[in-house]
Structures are given as C-alpha cells and as structure tokens.
Regions:
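A short pre-motif secondary-structure segment
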Residues: 25-29
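Exposed, low-complexity/repetitive linear segments and helix-based recognition motifs
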Residues: 3-4, 18, 35, 60
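Short coil/turn segments at secondary-structure junctions
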Residues: 2, 40-41
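The N-cap/first-turn positions of alpha helices
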Residues: 21-22
Length: 69
C-alpha cells in the first residue's frame, strides 16, 4: 500500500510539472475518465488536438517519472 501511495504522489507531482494544456487533458482523460470527444467539446478543441495533447503529455510524464527514479 505504501508503494501505491508513493507512486500516486510521484505521478501527481509530475502532472504539476506539465504545461497547463497537458495537465488539463491528462486530468480530464485519466482522473475524470472523460472520453476524448467530450474533452474536445469541453475545451472547444478539435478531437485530433486533444488526442495529440494526451499523447504528448503521456510522453512528457514518462520522461519526468524516469528522471525522478
């Protein structure tokens, strides 16, 4: 259980280091579990832009988490 809490803390800290655009789509997609089409509608963005931001944000998160270990 401690490891899960530590992992969640690391991920939350990494999300805070993302750009506002990236952290917003990550929160909406993975924390609020909204579909990409809904995120696009809420943010007033094309679906492709939302998918691209999620992909880029995930890549950045991986880099941040790899650097932290």
């Amino acid at each position: 259980i401690v490891s899960r809490v530590e992992d969640a803390t690391r991920v939350a800290a990494a999300i805070e280091r993302l750009s506002v655009e990236q952290s917003t789509v990550i929160r909406l997609s993975f924390i609020e579990e909204r579909p990409h089409s809904e995120i696009a509608a809420v943010l007033g963005l094309p679906l492709g832009t939302v998918k691209s931001r999620i992909r880029l944000a995930m890549n950045r998160l991986r880099d941040l988490l790899d650097d932290a270990t």
